[in-house]
Amino acid sequence: MKFLDLCKVYIRSGAGGGGCVSFRREKYIEYGGPDGGDGGTGGSVWAEAVDGLNTLIDFRYQQHFFAKNGQPGMGRQRTGKDGDDIVLRVPVGTEILDEDQETVICDLTEVGQRVQLARGGNGGFGNLHFKSSTNQAPRRSNPGQDGVERTLWLRLKLIADVGLLGLPNAGKSTFLAATSNARPKIADYPFTTLHPNLGVVGVDNTEFVVADIPGLIEGASEGRGLGDLFLGHIERCAVLLHLFDGTSETLIEDYHTIIGELEAYGVGLADKPRITVLNKIDALDEERRAMALKQLNNVCGGGVMAMSGVAGDGVTDVLRKLRGEISDEPLRHKPVEEKEPWRP
């Protein structure tokens, strides 16, 4: 399934049905009076977060969503049928933005959460409403209220517990593949990952979700490389895992590049809890590994961990560190299977 995290939609709620001008006409009733019914209410446009979706690709092929109009009123005080609502089903974590792409209308973060995007127009009054002591036979009714037209943007921000950070080829996808059932594309060239990937990672009978985003480069906040569009997918993460390529000759510059892009993006991303890890230690000898760890500890203030996503060295320690940083609320505890004792 193709990944799409930003799309534009056009919506219109249904117009209300017009009121009816009608008079009671029955045998032996000479002056029946007005009996025109009201028009039906137009359909509304809703958005609902549903489970099982992780992309907005469906909205690439259909961008226009129009609710049904209400039916006009009828004689014998019959109200017209209401127009059918239309529901936009979106993934959990979808933000709905106004046409300016800045004003947030709603953030759908829970399954089943709904929001009304455009309310249907009210139906018009039939002539029964205009009867008075001075006007016993009104020939007047109201038209239905027009529907509402809007242009909106949908932006998907994946919901994960841990977000992976790093320059291209830092080993983020390798780490995700080694610790979960996710199978992102892995190759020895930059920007192998072109869209975010999610994986469920388990350690010590608990599970949490890890998000892998495309690598950042200097100037990403200005649109270089793949830009910073994908940083929105780690806004909701409880902790960030910053991976460094241990074979890089410019570790300090690499650190400042990523931190600079986080600060340029804003929304407090640079202030999130962050675990720094030196990756690919299987490709380093003892002396070079010690030197790289010393450099990173000096610039980060200590606490740098080391691992190899390919060989698996230190991966469990990193997962346990991540688990400790995540609050207990989002952690999913796996049931421990108790085996019955063997009986002859």
From Swiss-Prot:
| Species, as recorded | Roseobacter denitrificans (strain ATCC 33942 / OCh 114) (Erythrobacter sp. (strain OCh 114))
Subunit details: Monomer.
Segments traversing the membrane: none
Gene this protein is translated from: obg
Domain OBG-type G, which positions? 160-327
Q: What is this protein called?
A: GTPase Obg
Its cofactor is:
Mg(2+)
Where along the chain is GTP bound?
Answer: 166-173, 191-195, 212-215, 279-282, 308-310
Q: Which residues form the Obg domain?
A: 1-159
The Swiss-Prot or TrEMBL record describes its family as follows: Belongs to the TRAFAC class OBG-HflX-like GTPase superfamily. OBG GTPase family.
Query: Per the record, where are the segments of Polar residues compositional bias?
Result: 130-144
